[in-house]
From Swiss-Prot:
Phosphoserine: residues carrying this PTM: 105, 152, 162, 226, 241
Membrane topology qualifier: Multi-pass membrane protein
Protein name: Putative metal ion transporter C17A12.14
Origin superkingdom: Eukaryota
Biased composition (Basic and acidic residues): 117-136
Keyword tags: Membrane, Phosphoprotein, Transmembrane, Transmembrane helix, Transport
Spans through the membrane: 560-580, 590-610
Claim: Signal is one of the keywords in the record: no
Length: 617
């Protein structure tokens, strides 16, 4: 046992060694002895820094070192010790048969092993070649954490260079320390291998044979067409066919929705583009992308950066492409289930971007409905998926043709161009909103309470304000998370990971981020203006209604005073109109008549003058 005075040993490391040498439990309430033969072996001859380096991944504290399961476990389950939690948390998927894992068959599930670049391989040297002796037969902590190894995201079906093959090589007692140090299983892992999840298919090159086999299967099922029909269809599908520009930009025309068209006349679903080919290849089915006698490997290796655009993909097509290009099951799940959340994720051989656009047809019932756009960007190519027709791929291809000879196109640039074109699609709508907001604001401020009749031509003002605010909220919902996605993608450009975007793309992504931030700020400003205009309009309407009510009350008050003046006159005339004896009835002449009429007029005039004097009317 090393001395405490000769060198400085970490507290957890020394206590671990001391507890092991004294054969006593570390805690009084531990259910099993600490001298178990499953204890993680540490060479006492190691220097403190070396021992600490050997346990860095697992942690250098007492509770962070690997501990075996209890020997008193029942029914094959480990006892839970709250004082000694496991050093590695269990994975979310605790079973290889979890629904989140996608394997072709049960045979693939059985052939699960640790990859060569698993983080635990760093520790393999210490517990397999201790003091130059083989310890293969000794119990290893790796055997106790097999559940973690299976549930870890760093697993894939066995291959020729699997974990077990390395164990077979280490089983030879004649192996030297230099051979162990040079072996790939004991090499120091890079940052990519430690933190990036890998796909089930760990092959560096795509398996184009999977696409070729699937093509043969689909061609065999296409027997109802004659050979001439198939050739004509392929000849038509492989021509360059870009839609026309509308007002300077391409807009999807819903031509095929007016009446039912044949299978051949339906819109293209697959588009293969590379700057080395003279034309773009369009097809309805994936197997139609290649000629007779041509393989997908010849197509994708035709030179330059390739781009495969898939519109309205079927689940079978997604899984075939995932199997051929080694796309992770999590990415396949996001594409199949049409994940709405915009994000960027890095995997071992590619990075995955989810972006959202919208339906740009005002005549469509799904106008401004969000459309999901998925980008799987490899180092030498890109695959895009979208569930609805969208103009962005055609716009980017046209842009690449225009810039041909001025710039070298790569997969990262195509991804940037798609994000940029999607962002630019919001600009015309924001300009339209700006004009509408200025018109509404000026019309509301021009309303004056002295001109009540001017309110009548603006009966739809509230409706216009409501529609404009609805459009603003829809665009804000689409632009809300885009800045975070572009910002996250820009940060990846400065990372050292192999699949991260190249550094020069960060400049272009910064421009896209500036556009998004500016659009969001403008929309928020327009929303505030409309909110203020809405309140001003309602206040102006309330004032106008109050003025109209006051005028009505004034007229009613005048009529009331007039009625008050005429009531005495009606009383006098009513009295003299009775069929009874009245004064002056027998007097000849009209003296009594004019005197009564004059007195009534004098009373009315004097009453009116008196009301005017006191400003009653």
């Amino acid at each position: 046992m090393p001395s405490n005075t000769s060198r400085s040993v970490p507290t957890g490391f020394y206590y671990k060694q001391n507890a092991r040498m004294q054969n006593r439990p570390r805690f009084s309430d531990r259910k099993h002895s600490s001298k178990s033969k499953h204890r993680f072996p540490v060479d006492p001859s190691l220097q403190p820094d070396e021992a600490d380096e050997g346990t860095r991944l697992l942690g250098n504290s007492d509770s962070d070192l690997l501990e075996p399961p209890s020997e008193h476990s029942s029914n094959g389950e480990d006892d839970k010790d709250i004082n000694n939690p496991p050093s590695m948390p269990s994975s979310v998927c605790s079973s290889p048969k979890s629904p989140h894992r996608h394997y072709e068959s049960d045979e693939d599930i059985e052939n699960i092993s640790l990859p060569e670049s698993h983080p635990e391989d760093i520790q393999r040297k210490e517990f397999e070649t201790e003091n130059g002796k083989n310890t293969r037969d000794q119990p290893s902590p790796l055997a106790e954490v097999s559940d973690f190894a299976i549930s870890s995201p760093h697993v894939y079906p066995k291959s020729a260079n699997s974990h077990d093959s390395h164990y077979e090589q280490f089983a030879n007692n004649d192996v030297t320390e230099s051979a162990v140090d040079d072996h790939p299983a004991t090499r120091k892992l890079s940052r990519d291998e430690l933190y990036l999840p890998i796909s089930p298919n760990n092959a560096q090159e795509p398996k184009f044979s999977v696409l070729d086999e699937w093509t043969k299967k689909m061609v065999a099922n296409f027997e109802e067409y004659s050979v001439e029909d198939v050739d004509k269809r392929r000849e038509r599908n492989r021509k360059l066919s870009e839609p026309l520009l509308v007002n300077g930009r391409y807009r999807v025309r819903d031509r095929w929705a007016q009446f039912r068209k044949s299978e051949i006349e339906k819109p293209y679903r697959f588009t293969f583009f590379t700057d080395e080919l003279p034309s773009t290849i369009h097809s309805h089915e994936m197997w139609e992308l290649v000629h007779d006698g041509q393989s997908f490997e010849d197509l994708f290796h035709s030179g330059g950066t390739w781009w495969l655009d898939v519109s309205c993909p079927k689940e079978e097509e997604i899984r075939v492409l995932a199997k051929a290009f080694g796309i992770h099951p999590l990415t396949v799940e996001d594409i199949t289930l049409e994940e709405d959340r915009e994000k960027v994720e890095l995997f071992r051989t590619y990075y995955f971007v989810t972006f959202r656009s919208f339906n740009q047809l005002p005549s469509n019932s799904e106008y401004l409905k969000p459309l999901n756009f998925y980008l799987v960007v490899f180092r030498d190519g890109i695959i895009t998926f979208h569930m609805n027709p969208t103009p962005h791929p055609a716009n980017v291809r046209r842009r690449i043709r225009q810039l041909n000879g001025y710039l070298t196109v790569n997969a990262d640039w195509i991804a940037y161009a798609l994000l940029d074109d999607t962002t630019d699609a919001f600009a015309p709508f924001i300009e339209q909103i700006e004009d509408e907001v200025d018109t509404i604001d000026s019309m509301i401020l021009s309303i004056h309470y002295d001109h009540v009749m001017e309110v009548k031509p603006q009966e739809r003002m509230l409706q216009r304000v409501g529609e404009c605010r609805k459009l603003i909220m829809s665009l804000l919902r689409l632009l809300a998370n885009k800045a975070d996605v572009v910002r996250g993608l820009s940060k990846r450009c400065n990372e050292s990971w192999q699949v991260a975007p190249r550094g020069e793309i960060a400049l272009y992504l910064g421009d896209v981020q500036d556009h998004i931030v500016t659009m969001v700020q403008n929309l928020n400003h327009y929303e505030k203006i409309l909110s203020r205009s809405h309140s001003n309009y309602l206040a102006q309407i309330s004032i106008n209604m109050t003025l109209v009510s006051n005028e009505t009350n004034e007229v009613l008050s005048r009529l009331t005073i007039l009625g008050t003046i005429l009531i005495p006159l009606n009383l006098v005339t009513g009295l003299w109109g009775m069929n009874v004896k009245v004064p002056g009835q027998d007097v000849p002449g009209l003296g009594w008549f004019f005197s009564i009429l004059g007195s009534l007029m004098i009373f009315a005039i004097s009453s009116f003058i008196l009301c005017k004097w006191y400003k009653v009317i």
